[in-house]
């Protein structure tokens, strides 16, 4: 169902000659912002860093004491080859690991299953047994490195294998640190890699909440993901709204299963996309943090301040990378990573510039990691907390994103929550994706090297 013009969440198609400027969420950008664009009660809306409503960040000092975790997503072919890449990243300064699995593993299939022909090791590492997990983490001390696993339907099985490898290393389960994505709802909405119907799959998700509370208390039990919605074509407002709506669904399901909110909510984490519009992205992260704090405190009655904090990982936008003039992607990734840092991310993956063409080479992976290090040590973005706070433009954007996202969440609530609203969210994202393509097609939106500054005889990288 399309939204009305008054409550638009995607940009209109107006043509390249229209003087108006819009974000992808349909927010019209004024030529100039001033103090009368600031929201009322701004000091209360902002709060202090590390304090409710966490608009300015979940920690008081943010990056002054410690930079975000530089967690590069990697995994391909065999466990041995993935292990080599993990060692390479750690040796070059990565401070955490992020494990990519192939599609058969994501669907709970063994590599020798006939249905897996042509897919084994293609999009990530194939893990068929504990032997593969042992090889993948050979020589990597699991008490020193935190690992994020991008796995959903069979998340509990892969976490158990990881736990057992840790046990073999002499690392007690209570000392393991990391995250399982474990977000099955976004699979129905955006990716399609699910095994069971939604209701049963959500139960498995919340079962892992209970298991980790008892066995692996430092583990983040879920990474509630908006990243994939944005990759599928949603706007920034839709990314915030549908991610938090799914978060609401998981919290409610866990409570309905008998869990106490303050016993599982502090280990919930989120996963967002870092897109091209720096100012909108900074505003998006700030709005999401403020909204989640209120949802947890007011809607669910959480008392523990840790339950109010939206902690999130960011990956730069894969969908923004171009096969044409791929070196341009280095600049795109740097801007997206900069926005994520200025927006207060807890960890970050920066994409390789060649990922529109193939799995990243070692050179591309190193440049991506160096990009984070330059942001952290040279740009000044880490020197002060929430550097865009008080900006007329960013504060106005933060407020507008929050207002529009709240309206979308209300619509999901009216439909009975995320499980019942799967088709609604899919349709909204598809309409937004169509708008993206139309705006590019008519040159309303510009992609350098694709529909402007095109080279007739492009150089193909090695």
Pin down the residues of each PLM region.
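Catalytic alpha/beta active-site cores
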Residues: 2-275, 299, 306-313, 341, ...
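Flexible, glycine-rich loop/tail regions that form catalytic "lids" or insertion modules at the edges
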Residues: 10-40, 48-54, 103, 362, ...
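Short beta-alpha connecting loops at secondary-structure transitions
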Residues: 118-122, 186-196, 229-234, 272-277, ...
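Phosphate/diphosphate-binding loops
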Residues: 128, 146, 151-154, 166-168, ...
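Charged, flexible cofactor/metal-binding loops and thiol motifs
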Residues: 236-246, 278-291, 324-329
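Hydrophobic alpha-helix feature that most strongly marks membrane-spanning transmembrane helices
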Residues: 255, 273, 287-301, 335-342, ...
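Flexible glycine/proline-rich, aromatic-decorated loop/lid segments
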Residues: 263-264, 302-316, 324-353, 360-385, ...
